[in-house]
């Protein structure tokens, strides 16, 4: 590796909107603000909501369903 061309690698803090603070190593060099993290993301907390996409699928099939038939 060439000396002097690589960015500085430092420890920064990533702060989530839920208040969770995570220390990570990064070349960004400044603190990060996160919308969601592992402590508040619905997938990890088990509070998932099932989104009803049936209307979207029916609308798509109604518009483009005849194109797939030969």
Swiss-Prot record:
One of its GO terms (biological process) is translation. Zn(2+) binds at residues 16, 18, 37, 40. Binds 1 zinc ion per subunit. SUPFAM superfamilies: L28p-like (SSF143800). It holds the Pfam family Ribosomal_L31. PROSITE patterns: RIBOSOMAL_L31. NCBIfam families: L31, PRK00019.1, PRK00528.1. Belongs to the bacterial ribosomal protein bL31 family. Type A subfamily. This is Large ribosomal subunit protein bL31. It comes from Shewanella woodyi (strain ATCC 51908 / MS32). The gene is rpmE.
